[in-house]
Protein backbone atom coordinates (compact mmCIF):
# COMPACT_ATOMS: atom_id res chain seq x y z
CA UNK A 1 0.00 0.00 0.00
CA UNK A 2 1.06 3.57 -0.59
CA UNK A 3 -0.37 7.11 -0.33
CA UNK A 4 -3.32 7.53 -2.66
CA UNK A 5 -4.50 3.93 -2.30
CA UNK A 6 -8.07 3.26 -1.16
CA UNK A 7 -8.70 1.04 1.86
CA UNK A 8 -11.28 -0.05 4.41
CA UNK A 9 -10.81 -0.66 8.13
CA UNK A 10 -11.67 -4.33 8.79
CA UNK A 11 -13.40 -3.75 12.14
CA UNK A 12 -14.97 -0.34 11.37
CA UNK A 13 -17.11 -0.81 8.23
CA UNK A 14 -19.21 2.24 9.15
CA UNK A 15 -16.14 4.45 8.54
CA UNK A 16 -16.60 3.83 4.80
CA UNK A 17 -13.94 4.02 2.13
CA UNK A 18 -10.66 5.65 3.10
CA UNK A 19 -7.73 7.05 1.13
CA UNK A 20 -4.20 6.76 2.49
CA UNK A 21 -2.74 10.23 3.00
CA UNK A 22 0.70 9.31 4.36
CA UNK A 23 2.75 6.43 5.70
CA UNK A 24 5.56 7.05 8.19
CA UNK A 25 6.99 3.85 9.60
CA UNK A 26 4.05 1.83 10.91
CA UNK A 27 1.80 4.92 11.21
CA UNK A 28 -0.72 5.21 8.38
CA UNK A 29 -2.87 8.33 8.07
CA UNK A 30 -6.16 7.61 6.31
CA UNK A 31 -8.99 10.00 5.42
CA UNK A 32 -12.23 8.00 5.76
CA UNK A 33 -15.59 9.06 4.24
CA UNK A 34 -17.50 8.91 7.52
CA UNK A 35 -14.77 9.18 10.17
CA UNK A 36 -12.43 11.82 8.79
CA UNK A 37 -8.67 11.64 9.30
CA UNK A 38 -7.52 8.69 11.41
CA UNK A 39 -3.98 7.54 12.23
CA UNK A 40 -3.75 3.74 12.11
CA UNK A 41 -0.98 1.60 13.63
CA UNK A 42 -0.09 -0.72 10.75
CA UNK A 43 1.47 -3.16 13.22
CA UNK A 44 -1.94 -3.65 14.87
CA UNK A 45 -4.51 -3.18 12.07
CA UNK A 46 -4.24 -4.66 8.58
CA UNK A 47 -6.21 -2.35 6.30
CA UNK A 48 -8.16 -3.98 3.46
CA UNK A 49 -7.40 -2.67 -0.06
CA UNK A 50 -10.46 -1.43 -1.98
CA UNK A 51 -11.43 0.79 -4.90
CA UNK A 52 -13.93 3.64 -5.11
CA UNK A 53 -17.26 2.82 -6.77
CA UNK A 54 -17.38 3.72 -10.47
CA UNK A 55 -19.22 6.96 -11.20
How should these model regions be labeled?
Residues 1-3, 23-26:
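A short, compositionally biased
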Residues 28-32:
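SH3/SH3-like beta-barrel fold
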Residues 13, 33-35:
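Glycine-centered tight beta-turn/hairpin loop motif at sheet-sheet or coil-to-beta transitions
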Residues 16-23:
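Short beta-strand-centered aromatic/proline hotspots
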Residues 1-12:
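Short coil-to-beta transition motif at edge beta-strands of beta-rich domains
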Residues 14, 27:
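Residue-level detector of flexible, active-site-proximal loop/helix-junction positions
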Residues 36-55:
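Intrinsically disordered, low-complexity, charged/polar segments
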Amino acid sequence: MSPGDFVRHPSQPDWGLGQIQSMIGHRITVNFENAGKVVIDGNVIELVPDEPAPR
